[in-house]
């Protein structure tokens, strides 16, 4: 997340989730889970619900987020559950990754960056997917009218064709647009893309 406004918006949500014990996967995470295996990066992990679901399926997960409340929760939960989920507080605008992953997940994050930063971060994530590995990316796209959580000068609504264009040459395993109603007669329009990086032989996704 790129601005104080965005961080504060989600920090309050995460603190409420900790208080209530909310840990259900959202619809985008449910779509992603069957494609995850091996070493997984959850980039913008929030409360870590997807990270723990992946770990329970045998994955080893690096979970990064800008929210101290979320990462503290993840670290405590991982210790209690003895699961391989490693939570790290990180400024994801320019976080330098130093390893490759079998799967990279970035759900609901990149739209909180300005567009040049979002595109740069996406390229960095793509570069860290191993040959034959999978990327799962979910963003808000043009047509979204609910903007309450954004800094006015620091957000990015992707064009509807942006995702598939940036994954040209990859094998697209799943691609969809989803509309959700939002307050004050507004809406959120999401694009979700799951793609396999060309290269090494791989097992088919479950």
Region locations from a protein language model:
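A conserved beta-strand element that flanks and buttresses the S-adenosyl-L-methionine
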Residues: 105
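Conserved beta-strand/loop positions that form the S-adenosyl-L-methionine
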Residues: 43
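Conserved acidic residues
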Residues: 38, 102
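Class I (Rossmann-like) S-adenosyl-L-methionine-dependent methyltransferase catalytic domain
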Residues: 1-37, 46-85, 89-96, 113-120, ...
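Active-site charged/polar residues at nucleotide-handling catalytic sites that mediate phosphoryl
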Residues: 99
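Short catalytic micro-motifs in class I SAM-dependent methyltransferases
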Residues: 108-109
């Amino acid at each position: 997340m790129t601005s104080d406004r965005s961080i504060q918006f989600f920090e309050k949500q995460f603190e409420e989730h900790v208080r209530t014990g909310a840990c259900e996967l959202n619809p985008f995470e449910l779509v992603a889970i069957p494609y995850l295996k091996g070493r997984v990066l959850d980039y913008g992990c929030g409360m870590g619900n997807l990270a723990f679901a992946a770990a329970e399926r045998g994955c080893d997960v690096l979970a990064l987020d800008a929210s101290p409340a979320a990462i503290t929760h993840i670290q405590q939960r991982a210790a209690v559950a003895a699961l391989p989920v490693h939570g790290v507080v990180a400024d994801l605008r320019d976080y330098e990754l130093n390893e490759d992953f079998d799967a990279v997940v970035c759900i609901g994050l990149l739209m909180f960056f300005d567009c040049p930063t979002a595109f740069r971060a996406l390229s960095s994530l793509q570069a860290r997917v191993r040959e034959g590995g999978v990327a799962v990316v979910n963003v808000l796209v043009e047509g979204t009218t609910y903007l309450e959580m954004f800094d006015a000068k620091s957000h990015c609504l992707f064009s509807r064709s942006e995702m598939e264009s940036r994954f040209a040459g990859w094998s697209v395993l799943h691609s969809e647009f989803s509309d959700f109603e939002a307050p004050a007669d507004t809406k959120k329009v999401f694009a979700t893309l799951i793609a396999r990086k060309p290269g090494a032989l791989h097992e088919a996704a479950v």
